[in-house]
């Protein structure tokens, strides 16, 4: 059996895997255990009561967290004319059409989010094999193919997170940094839960939000007591 590191032993001793923690208690514990030499992200895993094998039960979308994610986001936009100017004014780092596509084909991808106006998809469509595997392909379901590219840029900059369940029906995303105060992390989590509830498939049966766990980049998962989240109980 692999030998436990000192850090892993501390986590094992501090975290009760059988317990559901109040959100404030959970955040305090995560902060205590976040000893990496960088500011760790706070990640969430939400187990949904869906059958991920059925296409009509898959959950996908995006929402802007009230306090952002703490990340600096670089945005690339495929647009032309007035839309291109609007994207630049909104803060997009890269704006173009064929010229931007050529950069990407050369492997120049210094961006985190790609947004496209509908008329630009004829250009973006050529990049599916490059952007798709990296989770960067624009998609109308998450608001990254839109006639209002300026709003999409502002949302990306403001802390929008995209979510999509995996094959086990679990949503994985980030809700902030470990140096956020507890109330901001709680409000970000509640905002995500509200978005997930709104996205509930009509065919999903039984308990929808089955389990919520928080963890830091280098830490263990802590299960959350959902009764302490107003978004869940109201």
Swiss-Prot record:
Classification via HAMAP family: Ribosomal_uL1_B
Quaternary structure and interacting proteins, as annotated: Part of the 50S ribosomal subunit.
Coiled-coil ranges from the UniProt annotation: none
Family (UniProt): Belongs to the universal ribosomal protein uL1 family.
The keyword Glycoprotein is annotated on this UniProt entry: no
Protein name as it appears in the record: Large ribosomal subunit protein uL1
GO MF term set: rRNA binding; structural constituent of ribosome; tRNA binding
GO BP term, pick one: regulation of translation
Organism (species): Yersinia enterocolitica serotype O:8 / biotype 1B (strain NCTC 13174 / 8081)
Disulfides per UniProt: none
Any one cellular-component term (Gene Ontology): cytosolic large ribosomal subunit
Entry function: Binds directly to 23S rRNA. The L1 stalk is quite mobile in the ribosome, and is involved in E site tRNA release.
Keywords: Repressor, Ribonucleoprotein, Ribosomal protein, RNA-binding, rRNA-binding, Translation regulation, tRNA-binding
PANTHER family (alphabetical): 54S RIBOSOMAL PROTEIN L1, MITOCHONDRIAL, LARGE RIBOSOMAL SUBUNIT PROTEIN UL1M
